[in-house]
């Protein structure tokens, strides 16, 4: 149910989207198949540990075409569709992203994730779809639709471990089905955005 009215407000929190270009360099090598396809990726992180910042730079690099650090090869950029439900990825102003999301990126700003993912598939034909903070049953249904349409997916979710995520009814089922080919765990050890682990879709540790 939508919130229609709020009153007796005692404080206000203003969140400012903060981009850090290059923060995804450490993980990009793990996110592509041998033939250059972007692998379905889930970023797991507690609040305030950098998952949205990491996703934002992943989007930019996938769109522009990253240069892998281990091989040094340039992977061609692809079209990316972003559903920015809370305007935290692109920070759009009058329809224009104020953060750099890449030259091949289309953004649906202030649009519900579950509806936006299906709208992008039907109208924009992206090769990769990116969303922040999934979790609802509707989100999972939209993700299944995206996968069945041949799009790759990049998403984030709140959690402190892979076991924690497996306990979430809807998302846990997706992971058991192998929907995500890469899973990245962030923690705040020493600094926000610290990469603690990277797994493949079968739970094998890659990093």
Annotated model-derived regions:
Residues 38-64:
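Glycine-rich phosphate-binding P-loop
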Residues 1-39:
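P-loop NTP-binding catalytic core
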């Amino acid at each position: 149910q939508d919130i229609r009215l709020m009153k007796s407000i005692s404080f206000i929190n203003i969140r400012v989207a903060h981009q850090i270009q290059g923060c995804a360099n450490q993980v990009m090598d793990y996110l592509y198949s041998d033939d250059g396809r972007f692998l379905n990726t889930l970023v797991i992180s507690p609040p305030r540990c950098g998952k949205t910042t990491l996703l934002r730079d992943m989007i930019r690099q996938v769109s522009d075409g990253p240069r892998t650090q281990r091989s040094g090869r340039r992977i061609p950029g692809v079209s990316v569709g972003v559903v920015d439900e809370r305007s935290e990825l692109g920070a759009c102003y009058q329809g224009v992203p104020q953060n750099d999301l890449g030259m091949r990126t289309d953004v649906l700003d202030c649009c519900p994730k579950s509806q936006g993912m299906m709208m992008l598939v039907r109208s924009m034909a992206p090769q990769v779809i990116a969303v922040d903070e999934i979790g609802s049953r509707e989100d999972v249904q939209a993700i299944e639709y995206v996968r069945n349409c041949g799009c790759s997916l990049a998403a984030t979710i709140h959690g402190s471990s892979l076991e924690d995520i497996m306990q979430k009814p809807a998302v846990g089922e997706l992971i058991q089905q192998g929907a995500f080919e890469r899973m990245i765990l962030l923690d705040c050890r020493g600094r926000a955005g610290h990469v603690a682990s990277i797994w493949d879709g079968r739970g094998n540790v890659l990093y």
